[in-house]
């Protein structure tokens, strides 16, 4: 929920702080650029303190950032966003790699289910913000969210992580064990993560602002449009394990980014709220299986060296989450059209489709 908070709350912050789209884009940049720091530190923290303490640390830091955002001005707000960005960066690779190692034979399915639980929070966040906005209680909502994170962190102190008492097992794969930094796929995979995270967050982060400008009435329906994106993404990740029983990972990912490109295209042609909802839903469904599949394929691409390169790859991915949403805002400000800015995730989806088509051909 925390990492999708900016999307639905961004129009409110834009009004409160008097921001242009380019300035609003700096919030996304701050969030994901700071998360790179957490991602680079995540492996060291897990190695030294274990998964449980690392996750507790991330939750507490995230709670601090959310609480500070409740009453912050523009400058202090950037700081608050950076704080929970670091927390997200710490917990994301730790959680994903823990699941990938534990369920190595079926890691793509397990990661899809894991990310489905994340999607529940992402879908609920816009609905809760819309409710809080109608009651003029958005700061109270942020304080409540912060308190919930603290409670969750405290509750984890009673949970025993078996793997923390063991040496983390190497992924059982048939991948290559050569120096991963010289692997011919390393740069391409890093770019793939960069483009995916950036494209997903560009749509999820800007769709509420886009819907608000299209809306012709005084209702706050636009605030819940991200829920259609994240809800479809949640549904897709819940269904992905079933699809993966009959479909190869790269084939499913290729179909996904094709559907995402179609969804963004519908958004770009929207003049009323109905196509916005349809486009956001198609884009979310299309993007849903791509990230879990990419994570699961790391072990096939890099073998036992996956843990050595994963931190850098995750960090590059989050850099995409920082850069591409900012580019959307910058293009919108320069060209005077958020519609033009949203061409960025469309190009990203088409670029990923090319990668999967080429990789599938080489694999064959």
Please give the residue ranges for each predicted region.
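Residue-level signature of mid-helix packing/kink "hotspots" within the transmembrane helices
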Residues: 4, 31-40, 123, 230-238, ...
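Extracytoplasmic gate region of multi-pass secondary transporters
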Residues: 6-7, 184-227, 231-235
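Interfacial helix-cap and linker-helix signal at transmembrane-aqueous boundaries
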Residues: 13-14, 45-46, 128-136, 211-212, ...
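Conserved MFS/SLC helix-loop-helix module at the cytosolic interface between two early adjacent transmembrane helices
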Residues: 36-75
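Helix-loop junctions at membrane interfaces in 12-TM secondary transporters
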Residues: 70-80, 269-278
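Cytoplasmic helix-loop-helix junction between adjacent transmembrane helices
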Residues: 81-116
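Helix-loop-helix hairpin linking two adjacent transmembrane segments in secondary transporters
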Residues: 105, 113-164
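C-terminal transmembrane helical hairpin of 12-TM major facilitator-type secondary transporters
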Residues: 250-294
């Amino acid at each position: 929920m925390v990492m999708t908070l900016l999307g639905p709350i961004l129009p409110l912050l834009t009004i409160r702080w008097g921001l242009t789209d380019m300035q609003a884009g700096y919030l996304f940049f701050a969030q994901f650029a700071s998360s790179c720091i957490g991602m680079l530190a995540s492996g060291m923290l897990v190695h030294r303190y274990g998964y449980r303490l690392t996750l507790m640390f991330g939750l507490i830091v995230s709670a601090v950032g959310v609480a500070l955002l409740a009453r912050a001005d523009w400058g202090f707000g950037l700081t608050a966003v950076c704080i929970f960005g670091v927390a997200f960066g710490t917990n994301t690779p730790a959680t994903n790699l823990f699941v990938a190692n534990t369920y190595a034979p079926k890691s793509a399915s397990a990661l899809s289910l894991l990310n489905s639980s994340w999607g529940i929070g992402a879908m609920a966040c816009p609905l809760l913000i819309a409710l809080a906005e109608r009651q003029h209680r958005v700061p109270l909502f942020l304080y409540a969210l912060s308190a919930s994170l603290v409670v969750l962190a405290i509750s984890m102190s009673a949970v025993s992580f078996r793997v923390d008492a063991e040496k983390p097992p190497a992924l059982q794969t048939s991948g290559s064990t050569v120096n991963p930094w010289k692997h011919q796929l390393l740069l391409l995979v890093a770019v793939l993560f960069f483009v995916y995270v950036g494209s997903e967050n560009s749509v999820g982060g800007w769709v509420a602002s886009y819907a608000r400008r299209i809306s012709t009435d005084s209702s706050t329906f636009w605030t819940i449009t991200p829920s259609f994106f994240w809800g479809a993404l949640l549904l897709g990740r819940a269904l992905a394990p079933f699809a993966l029983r009959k479909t190869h990972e790269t084939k499913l990912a290729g179909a996904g980014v094709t559907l995402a490109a179609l969804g963004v295209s519908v958004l770009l042609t929207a003049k009323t709220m109905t196509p916005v909802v349809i486009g956001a839903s198609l884009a979310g469904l299309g993007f849903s299986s791509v990230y879990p599949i990419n994570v699961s394929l790391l072990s096939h691409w890099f073998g036992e060296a996956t843990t050595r390169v994963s931190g850098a790859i995750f960090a590059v991915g989050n850099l995409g989450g920082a850069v591409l949403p900012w580019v959307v805002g910058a293009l919108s400000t320069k060209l005077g059209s958020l519609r033009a800015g949203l061409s960025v995730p469309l190009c990203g989806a088409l670029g990923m489709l090319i990668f999967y088509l080429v990789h599938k051909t080489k694999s064959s």
